Regions:
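N-terminal nucleotide-binding beta1-loop-alpha1 segment
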Residues: 1-17
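Short, well-formed alpha-helical segments that are part of the catalytic scaffolds
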Residues: 17-40
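Conserved N-terminal catalytic core of the sugar/cofactor nucleotidyltransferase
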Residues: 32-93
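Acidic donor-binding/catalytic loop of UDP-sugar-dependent glycosyltransferases
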Residues: 79-84, 99-116
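Conserved nucleotide-sugar donor-binding
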Residues: 92-93, 139-151, 196-200
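Short aromatic-hydrophobic micro-motifs that form the base-stacking/packing surface
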Residues: 94-98
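Conserved donor-nucleotide/metal-binding helix-loop-beta segment in metal-dependent transferases, i.e.
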Residues: 106-132
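Conserved alpha/beta core of the MobA/IspD/sugar-nucleotide pyrophosphorylase nucleotidyltransferase superfamily
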Residues: 142, 163-226
Length: 226
């Protein structure tokens, strides 16, 4: 049986917003927002947090341990090796690559992408090329076999930092662009945590949505409030 595993790339280090993975949005850590939402997926077979073996990322590993979430620790300088190690640790076949600084990611979009992957003979299912979703909701799905190939063949800095980068560099790879429903096409909305102003905005959104919809509010709820 094919195993589809989400790996969440999470680091505490950030030049613009240090410690952002453990920042509270509406009283809940950023990482917890994302993990809780991904656990509501109906198509994922599991998830794992990929972080570094550096001391500064201990809070991420400690959080994962307390909450019973799988966590892989690898190189602090090689995101591709770290992502591959996490996926191999989970014995996956298909990779769903997620950034930890996207706390309000809607699992329904992930599930739609997995369904497209299952029905098509392609190397990548992505929303990232069309860029119609709010920033922080894009999904990329590809095979573990492809990730292993990239890890062996690609040593460019872009590839080692962004594991899906090689898929977009050659016409060799078969890419399917996932089209999302029109009511989700709000590309001007930024739901990524990268700066203090992002933290302030997302914190206000979290508080407003929590009051109306509860802590696991979805994208529809966010758009209604925004």
């Amino acid at each position: 049986m094919t195993r589809v595993i989400a790996s969440i790339e999470a680091r505490m280090g950030s030049s613009r917003l240090p410690g952002k993975m453990m920042m509270l949005l509406g009283g809940i850590p950023v990482l917890e927002h994302l993990v809780t939402r991904m656990m509501k997926s109906e198509r994922l077979d599991g998830l794992i947090i990929a972080t570094s073996d550096q001391f500064g990322d201990d809070p991420i590993a400690n959080w994962a341990n307390r909450h019973g979430v799988q966590c892989y620790r690898g190189s602090g300088k090689d995101g591709m090796a770290r992502g591959l190690g996490a996926q191999e640790n989970m014995r996956s076949d298909v990779v769903v690559e997620l950034c930890g600084d996207t706390p309000f990611r809607d699992p329904r979009i992930v599930d739609d992408a997995i369904e497209e992957w299952n029905r098509r003979d392609v190397d990548l299912v992505t929303t990232a090329r069309l860029r119609t979703l709010p920033d922080g909701q894009d999904v990329e799905i590809f095979s573990l076999k492809a990730l292993k190939y990239f890890a062996e063949k690609h040593h460019e800095p872009e590839a080692r930092e962004h594991v899906s980068w090689p898929l977009y560099q050659s016409d060799t790879w078969r890419i399917h662009d996932l089209v999302v429903p029109e009511h989700w096409q709000r590309s001007a909305l930024r739901l990524v945590l990268d700066t203090p102003s992002d933290a302030q905005f997302l914190g206000h959104l979290a508080a407003a949505c929590d009051v109306k919809y509860g802590p696991t509010f979805n994208l529809d709820n966010l758009l209604a409030v925004f």
